Regions:
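Solvent-exposed beta-strand sheet faces enriched in polar/charged residues
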Residues: 4, 64, 227, 248, ...
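Non-catalytic surface loops within mature trypsin-like serine protease
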Residues: 12, 29, 120, 228-230, ...
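ABC transporter nucleotide-binding domain
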Residues: 168-256
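C-terminal coupling/interaction segments
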Residues: 257-306
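Hydrophobic side chains in well-ordered alpha-helices
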Residues: 73, 211, 235-236, 262-266
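ABC transporter nucleotide-binding domains
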Residues: 1, 8-183, 188-196, 200-202, ...
Length: 306
């Protein structure tokens, strides 16, 4: 799966919103990749480009060696989007059987039901299911065509904690077959626990791309915070080890990859007031990367693409 220089703008010329702003993204066969970003960052639009639901204004999109539309038409891609809902007045089994019949090489119905974890209520009508159960049926629909790639847009947004855990158990079982998974989420722990790789999108651009550890390291491995007490904020980014600076009110937060050197310099400058040092988390890195003063892109090495 490859996007090259993909751009998508919505609205009138000269007054539009650029939802995707020159994205370059390659996803290898068998990878599980999370798209992470704030609301409106461009995650859903990127997914729509990969599914052929929208066309880029410029740039190219290739999926499994062909156009996105052909990959979907050939039954190679399954999708679970935020909008839409399954047909209501049929049983779960009837729906999955119907969807499977529209594909050239579908997954056996019983297998799709089992993998999605809906076998226990396969003979119930869909309009009698809970919200969490309906969400799992949508997953079974995405599996029905036996796709090599499955794309999920905020798949666990309507699920409680236990239902989310069960869903990801099913997803990992699908991925272990050598299939490729791309999912968007705003749950940081979900991305960290279930993805081989995390792609952070902000304002339509990729600002970080790598493992959870890579993302954490991009904003410094430690956090040093202290009270400014009316002191100047200029030059904090020049302190030893500092890779990003956040100032909120009268308190500064420094992302640093050498907290000892940073603290020593603050002490030399007599700037230690209510100082705290802690290890950076994925959330800290995410907030730093998607702040107005975002860090430059961080990427891992090249990969075989699908």
């Amino acid at each position: 799966m490859v996007l090259t220089g993909a751009v998508k703008t919505f609205g009138r010329a000269g007054h539009g919103v650029r939802a995707v702003d020159g994205i370059d993204l390659s996803i290898g066969r068998g990878e599980t990749v999370a798209l992470l970003g704030r609301n409106g960052a461009g995650k859903s639009t990127t997914i729509r480009l990969l599914l052929g639901l929208d066309q880029p204004d410029s740039g190219t999109v290739r999926v499994l060696g062909r156009s996105a539309e052909h990959a979907v038409r050939d039954g190679l891609v399954g999708a679970m989007l935020q909008d839409g809902r399954p047909i209501q007045r049929v049983t779960v089994r009837e729906l999955i059987a119907f969807v499977a019949s529209t594909y050239p090489k579908p997954m056996p119905v019983s297998e799709a039901l089992s993998l999605a974890g809906v076998t226990g209520y396969a003979n119930r009508r869909i309009d009698k299911l809970s919200g969490g159960q309906t969400q799992r049926v949508r997953f079974a629909v995405a599996l029905a065509g036996n796709p090599e790639l499955i794309v999920l847009d905020e798949p666990t947004a309507a699920l409680d904690v236990e239902a989310r855990r069960t869903f990801w158990d099913s997803m990992r079982a699908y991925a272990r077959r050598g299939n490729t998974v791309l999912f968007s989420t705003h749950y940081l722990e979900e991305a960290d626990e279930n993805a081989d790789r995390i792609v952070v999108i902000d304002r339509g651009r990729i600002v970080a791309d790598g493992t959870g550890d890579t993302i954490r390291g991009s904003a410094g491995s430690s956090l040093v915070s202290f009270d400014l007490a009316g002191g100047p904020t200029g030059g904090l980014e020049l302190l030893p080890g500092v890779v990003a600076v956040e100032v909120s009110g009268d308190r500064a937060l420094l992302h640093t990859d050498d907290s000892d050197a940073t603290v020593r310099e603050l002490a030399r400058l007599d700037a230690i007031r209510n100082l705290q040092v802690s290890r950076a988390t994925l959330e800290d890195a995410f907030l730093s990367l998607t702040s107005p003063a975002a860090a430059p892109p961080v990427t891992d090495s090249e990969r075989e693409t699908v």
